């Protein structure tokens, strides 16, 4: 019987909730494995020896995160970066746009709901922050990556089952646009304008990018069956991260917009106006992957991890 351990680092524990959302299917998996460590689900502290598979959720945001990640790697035969935060840094990675001092000042002193008359920032017995959020693979060796925020329960089941059967887990290496059934122009995608998500009325059948919405599908791995675009009828935000063919998800999307934007047909819009149409550029293109980008921090903050 295989021994599985899980842990959470710089994250929200949502991937563990998705694991629990397997419901009865989780019982089938637990018949084949022994869950020996999972602080989210069990009252445990010490990391055990001789772990067969370790699932580590979350990126590295503190010295404690780094220590636990290294200890899990030392004790485990196989390490899985579990979820987008572990693989790419996730939404917490947007903190890389600010210094630790700015983040702590905001969190403990200046938010509207904060009551801290003494202006004290916790420091005693609180793990020190690293200088930036870092993906797991940049601090330890990772055997498999397992994206989404959080991964769908059925995907978790398929990956764990494959590993238990000593098979390679199969993850899609196509992007969303390659599998999305929304209708595209026979001439290819041409974007004549850019809208924010609340503007206009979304056509439920037509390509969202052609309608002017910043849909990250062209730069995002197709492992969720285009759930947002087809079920929620909202643009993809890129939570699965890029395919193996893409080095930088945001750069890929910027390149796609530059290629598809309607700048030659009667010069409908000056291409120089394109950046001004995107209100939150980093949040739009790097919401989930900034720490793994070619430029993972603001250039005046480009320091070592600790």
Swiss-Prot record:
Pfam families named in the record: Oxidored_q6
Assigned EC number: 1.12.99.-
Keywords: Oxidoreductase
Coiled coil: none
Induction: By selenium deprivation.
Classification via SUPFAM superfamilies: HydA/Nqo6-like
InterPro entries: Hydrogenase_assoc-protein, NADH_UbQ_OxRdtase-like_20kDa, NiFe_Hase_small_N_sf
Highest taxon of source: Archaea
Gene Ontology terms, MF aspect: iron-sulfur cluster binding; oxidoreductase activity
Bilayer-crossing regions: none
Family of the protein in this entry: Belongs to the [NiFe]/[NiFeSe] hydrogenase small subunit family.
Known partners and oligomeric status: The F420-non-reducing hydrogenase vhc is composed of three subunits; VhcA, VhcD and VhcG.
Protein name: F420-non-reducing hydrogenase vhc subunit G
Organism: Methanococcus voltae
